[in-house]
Amino acid sequence: MKFELDEKRRVVRIVPEREEDLYFIYLLIDRGDIVRGWTVREYKPEGAKEGERVKMYLGISVEKIEYHKFRSSLRVRGTVVEVQEEVEGVKGRRHTFEIVPGREVVVEKRRGSVEVVKRILDMANVALPRILLVSIDDEEAALAYISALGAEIMYTVPNQVNRGKRGESLLEDFFKSVNTLVEEVKRLRKIDRVVLAGPGMVVDQAGRYIRGERVVQSSGGVAGVYEFLRSGLYDKLKEELGLEAYSRLQKMLASQRDLVALGVEEVKEAVSIGRAETVLILDTYMKEKPDEAWEILSQVYNTGGKVYIVREDTEVGAAIRAMGNIVALLRW
């Protein structure tokens, strides 16, 4: 994602390059922000009998943000507050921006800390390839798409064993069916790298049918996806997704509960006196309670703390949701 941040004016100029960039723009935009960009809308000049579709540059005050992960769609709805001088009758009307890769959008932040904005931009700027992880054993294969957003398990493929075959031929049809799916995903998602992970013998056999970097680990299938993410192979990904911080949280819950704050009230209290060293916050909570969330995060940055924004639809996200949407590791 290409971007320029004017901290003084609180303006971010963004050009999304990949579909996953839309998620980070979704995190950036809140109700009340001003979003500007080129768009096309129906326009009927005064005296004209019929309207026509006209390209124009607009600014809207944001009222609603709609992000659909599986459709890779981001729509921003609001009221027009800025428009080209020669265009009349548009200001005050409602408009929807469709934000897509390759099209510039300008966001003027009206609330929250610039440090939080910078954190979101840093997350978006992580140089990670698009990885298709094929986690496989002799019973199941799981295909997971790994990007700066984390891991999305796209397909699970059970091995439909043909009892009439023996030895390696028992797995041949299974490997071929998995490879067919792999080639389809590579085409649709523009994959940079395929990683084949699982028990050594299975990975060696599968590698004759599925081309990719081989990683030996104890498990395949869905369990193997999570084993892969916990491994040291993609430490930068683990850091950005908050997996390292969450691992520390789990250890401290077991041994030093007084150095952990769980839920909004505990975290607020800790943040107010500068105790919060690291905060993990759910992306959905930031959208459900934006004023509350931005106030907490601003205080965290003002006291030198770190923030990790975690997707709810991940293993860590589900745990944080159960703990009250936000957790903190404390200094003392």
Curated annotation (Swiss-Prot):
Highest taxon of source: Archaea
EC numbers on record: 3.1.-.-
GO CC entries: cytoplasm
Subcellular location: Cytoplasm
Disulfide bonds: none
Enzyme class: hydrolase
Residue runs in coiled coils: none
Requisite cofactors: a divalent metal cation
Cross-referenced Gene3D superfamilies: 3.30.1330.30, eRF1 domain 2 (3.30.420.60), Pelota, domain A (2.30.30.870)
Keywords on record: Cytoplasm, Endonuclease, Hydrolase, Metal-binding, Nuclease
Gene Ontology terms, MF aspect: endonuclease activity; metal ion binding
Chief subcellular location: cytoplasm
GO biological processes: nonfunctional rRNA decay; nuclear-transcribed mRNA catabolic process, no-go decay; nuclear-transcribed mRNA catabolic process, non-stop decay; ribosome disassembly; RNA surveillance
Function: May function in recognizing stalled ribosomes, interact with stem-loop structures in stalled mRNA molecules, and effect endonucleolytic cleavage of the mRNA. May play a role in the release non-functional ribosomes and degradation of damaged mRNAs. Has endoribonuclease activity.
Assembly and binders: Monomer.
Stated family: Belongs to the eukaryotic release factor 1 family. Pelota subfamily.
Domain topic, free-text comment: The N-terminal domain has the RNA-binding Sm fold. It harbors the endoribonuclease activity.
Name used for this protein in its record: Protein pelota homolog
